[in-house]
């Protein structure tokens, strides 16, 4: 479930700018002195952005979060379970679910960490996101906005409207000069967020064109693996929401529209075979040659609170977690 969260951002912003938490301990009648700071010459070897005229650092990238958590339940991740587990009792946390009698694997939804979500995903509206963009543009004049939500929008009809409305606001802002036309936007998105599900599964080309017009440049896609079987194993747990065919449709579609998508790959998935390992390496290499960026991590690292971590901790899987410093 996704719910829009209406927060009076204008009031909050003005509060932080005019007073802020740092000012709460100050008496109202104390006159604040302006502190002059001498700035020396910039280090020519420093790679931080420096304004050559004022010797002051300037902001190139703004990082924003617009939602409470990710609705997906990937087996290695705890984003979806944080609110659930923070409200769970010790008895609920330690409960051992009953194994299926037919010899099948325990369904992930039977776990405390992956059960029904007591909290919907809250996100701020396109208008509120746009307002935050404008305020940061006015104050910092950045070059890039990075939306750091695990899933910036969801691939449902309301989710598509959410991102399309934001794109329209950004496009209009660039046309009127309210936003610098060269500003870029980056975000993380799931493969399924680019796919129209009904009546037939197809690439949402209209959305991709709208994203490009608005200035979206880079998408980090949580592919994890190109091996079809591994998409539904417990440590990955895509639960049949996406297929390898979907992955190829979206990645190739983004390439065809002039994007260079970033594909996140976990190289050593615990349940995989040698054949699947080589297959994933082969497909990833082919996409690299086409211009796709491959963000590859060698090991699957389960977060505490994730489904696979709970299975391991409760002895419900033959998999073991071995932690090392590297």
Label the model's feature ranges.
Residues 1-10:
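A charged, well-structured terminal subsegment
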Residues 6, 146, 220, 295-296:
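Residues embedded in well-ordered beta-strands within globular domains across many folds
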Residues 13-260, 282:
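Radical SAM [4Fe-4S] cluster-binding motif and immediate context
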Residues 72, 105-112, 155-158, 229-234, ...:
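Flexible glycine/acidic-rich beta-alpha junction loops that bind and position SAM and/or redox cofactors
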Residues 81, 222, 265-267, 299:
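Residue-level recognition of beta-strand->loop/alpha-helix junctions
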Residues 243-247, 282-288, 300-305, 318:
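C-terminal, active-site-flanking charged/polar segments
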Residues 271-285:
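Catalytic cores of alpha/beta
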